[in-house]
């Protein structure tokens, strides 16, 4: 765990050395009394907002703990909740200073932001109608059956599906988990 926290700390130090659009460092913003803007999407259990907008979820707790070890208190942070698909654009548009959320490290995302070391490895899962009438167990089955794959815009499953040959014509991209469930 200590090695893990050090890895997160290195990531955050790198983030703090990156200059914002105005070429002002995050450290100088904090010294001036401005708050660090922690952006996250609603991705339970990774990151979500509590009743008072506070950052909850295990990746938010890790980030806040590392920030505290760096001398940055929770009082020096403010939370910004984004739609999942708005996390990276919000960071790049300077609407947040850092983002959390249990995000997969994808080549396309690395072109737009820096990542910490991975904190876990997760696979994809598919939700199908009761009884799995089309026999869909993987991406190859989606291609074989011609089924429509519903996933979130900006989710890792878009790149994974393409990698396994699912054509864009068989994908429906929606906003987040609620949109996925509604499309089912």
Feature names for model-found ranges:
Residues 9-18:
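Bacterial N-terminal signal peptides
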Residues 37, 42-44, 53-70, 125-181:
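Bilobed "Venus flytrap"/periplasmic-binding protein-like clamshell domains
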Residues 64, 77-141:
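Acidic, polar ligand-binding/catalytic clefts
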Residues 24-101:
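Extracytoplasmic small-molecule ligand-binding "clamshell" domains
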Residues 18-23, 176-184:
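Short, intrinsically disordered, charge-balanced linker/junction segments flanking boundaries
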Residues 1-9:
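Bacterial N-terminal signal peptides that target proteins for export
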Residues 46-48, 109, 159:
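Glycine/Thr-rich phosphate-binding loops of Rossmann-like dinucleotide-binding domains
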């Amino acid at each position: 765990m200590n090695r893990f926290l050090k890895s997160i700390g290195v990531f955050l130090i790198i983030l703090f050395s990156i200059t914002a659009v105005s070429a002002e460092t995050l450290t100088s913003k904090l010294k001036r009394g401005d708050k660090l803007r922690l952006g996250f999407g609603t991705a339970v259990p990774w990151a979500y907002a509590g009743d008072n907008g506070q950052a909850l979820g295990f990746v938010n707790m890790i980030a806040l703990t590392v920030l505290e070890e760096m001398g940055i208190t929770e009082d020096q942070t403010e939370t910004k909740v984004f739609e999942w698909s708005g996390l990276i654009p919000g960071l790049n548009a300077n609407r947040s200073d850092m983002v959390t959320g249990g995000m997969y490290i994808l080549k396309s995302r690395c072109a737009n932001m820096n990542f910490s070391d991975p904190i876990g490895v997760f696979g994809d899962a598919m939700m199908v109608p009761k009884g799995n009438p089309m026999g869909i167990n993987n991406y190859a089955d989606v291609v074989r059956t011609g089924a429509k794959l519903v996933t979130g815009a900006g989710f890792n499953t878009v790149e994974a599906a393409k990698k396994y040959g699912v054509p864009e014509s068989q994908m429906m991209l929606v906003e987040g988990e609620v949109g996925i469930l509604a499309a089912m």
